[in-house]
Amino acid sequence: ICTGISVAIAAVIVWFAVRYKNLWAAVLAGVQVVGTLILEFMFSHGIEVPYGLYFDSLSLLMTFIIGVVGSGICIYALGYMEDFQAHEPEGAPDRRPMFFALMFVFLSAMYVIVFSNNMEWMFTGWEVTTLCSFLLIGYTRTEEAVANAFRQIIMNLAGGIGFLVALWCCALTVGTFSFYEFLVIGQNNPALTTLAVTALAFAGITKAAQMPFQTWLLGAMVAPTPTSALLHSST
């Protein structure tokens, strides 16, 4: 399932990249999906993660934050998007259902990230948030919105490749995709997990829009205000 979702996401990104003639987005999406497919065929069937989900006090705290903040943004978006649509040119299609669908899918993917003990599950949630962010930032389809959406997707795909490198490191060095087992191994033998942790840190920096990747989040402010609020709060 995770591999199928990854392929579908890459296909959507490549379609937009071809449509808007953005080579970097297409190349990075291609690299990511090829790396994912090779990883799946080489290792995934031989690596079992007994517990796909993991609950602790920190994950429950994050659930509360996502639920409260995310729900508040969605409620605010109801009125905002009604006014937004009213200011659209006469006869313009009402795309609010797609907007709210993307918001809800984004929040759902965040829950997957928070609760996943399986690194592949987390990676899938990670990719879903990347695609949703791209579509939300480019919602208005203006030239500026499209340019900023591609800036986001390029930086986030680079981070996704960093996450993929971490998965490869885990498969080759520690032989597990379980976060719990990974942490135990890291405590007992830090050298085995150093490269994977470094790759995960790079992925986190890009997703959180930390320097020098902060420009994609600033570009999100061209989107409707609920999008900007959602992305700023989630990072």
Where are these regions (language model features)?
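...captures the hydrophobic TM-helix bundle architecture rather than a specific catalytic motif
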Residues: 1-235
